[in-house]
Amino acid sequence: MAPDHPVYRLILDRALSGSHPELRRDKYKLGLVIEGGAMRGVVSAGMVAGLESLGLRRVFDVVYGASAGAFNGAYFLAGQAAFGTTIYYENLNTKNFINFWRLFQGKPVVNLEYVLKKVLVEEKPLHWPSVLNSPIPLKIVVSSLKMLKPVLLSGFKNKEELFEALYATAKMPLLSGGPVEIGGDRFLDAGLFQSIPVFAALEDGCTHMLILLTRPQGSRRKKSTLWDKYLFARLINRWQKGLGDCYLRMPDTYNECLSFIDQKEKDQERGPFLISLSLPADYLPLSRLEKNAELLRRAATESQNLVCRILQNRL
């Protein structure tokens, strides 16, 4: 992408002028949009670590996170992005988090309680007061079962509200159990409706967006399988009528979002302005349940280096 892209220009102008969220000299709203994807989230974790190393946190006005991307956004706003990246290859890649044997015990394969109660509190403690007090709000995308659409959760008043939203956005259907109840609604993983919270950021008024993708450049999701259609969708539909159809549309919804990003990236004349960062097309995609520490660590390093290489040359 051209070095004079409007998103890069805004990041550069704000970085060099010392602009910060509480004293902006421009009229724009720059959002950091972070994709998740379970263990693929290590990619966007490495990217926010790169932004942190360049001292670029203060150039953003809002951070939007979906699924694992919300966790990465929280560590980023706490000033712990590099620290937070290590959870993928030191904590989450263990049987404490992913354990297929739990199926035989009638329990979810993915143990989110371990993340919220152990990793974020004891093993790799998130400094949550910094997230709550940040002048840059964290807005977390979740999937509402009541409305069958994505919803933004924000304005967290305490640790419990923040962790509850993180729990909901990462609640993968079936793999990590059933819906999470918050305020009279039930929520599941953001990926049901919006794995990449671009449209949420647009509706929230962003004029510029830096989008961190966790799949290699040019990747697209494959169509739903017969297993999806005749088993998983029917199971999920028990939670809410119509939810199974939403589940089956996930690949199309995701691919349409990527096509929209591709189209908008090329338009440097009319806003809103979007630009995305992703690993090269020939990079081997990670599984969302990847447990190989070496592959995860390498993905984090490559992603951090990518961000530094692209943005450092412009600063």
Spans of features found by a protein language model:
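Patatin-like phospholipase
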Residues: M1-V63, A74-L315
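Gly/Ala-rich beta-loop-alpha elbow adjacent to hydrolase catalytic centers
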Residues: G65, G69
